[in-house]
Amino acid sequence: LRKTVLRSLGSAGITLVVLLLLWQAVVSLTGISSFIAKGPLDVWGFLFMSEDAADNRAQMFPLVGQTLADSALGFVVGMAVAVVLAVAFSLFRAIEAGVMPLVLLLRTIPLVSIAPVIILMTGRGTTASVAVIGTIVVVFPALASVLFGLSRASQQSLDVVHVFGGGRLTSLLKVNMPGALPSIFAAARVSVPGAVTGALLAEW
């Protein structure tokens, strides 16, 4: 186990170094203006080498913390909405027929185009705007994954529940939901980058 952890950390470290080197190479070789794109060396100098480095860190780190908090809020709300919708869709097909087209419609509309409307309705930088935008970003991939997991329940297990008099809700709680846990965790892992993107868009 220790070797596996060390190997994973080593691979992650090497990947990070390679990405930083590629980032710096692209910025340096293409001659992109520093006003448009900063390289890792520019960021390092801004945070640790310049005369105002201490002030820069004091100003930036609280903002990073706020963005992470906003990302967590959008992630939690989006995942919760996705799970609730998936359960409702599994229990009541009429709800799926009525709500799924709206979810697909939100997915096809670029979020950048509707974000200003959401911010006007909920306020710039408010908890509501962060939650709404984060939910829109997170809910579709998470919903698709959770629905897939719920539909993959063992038919034999479902038959056992039905033989003992269990209904759809019992089957959902005792068979479908436990069987969907891997898909829920996979949805959570996939949704994290989307939650960060949603938080940045809501703050912008």
State what each model feature region is.
Residues 1-17:
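Transmembrane alpha-helical segments of polytopic membrane transport and secretion proteins
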Residues 104-141, 148-149:
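Generic hydrophobic transmembrane alpha-helix motif, especially the helices
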Residues 150-156, 160-180:
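Short helix-to-coil transition segments within interhelical loops
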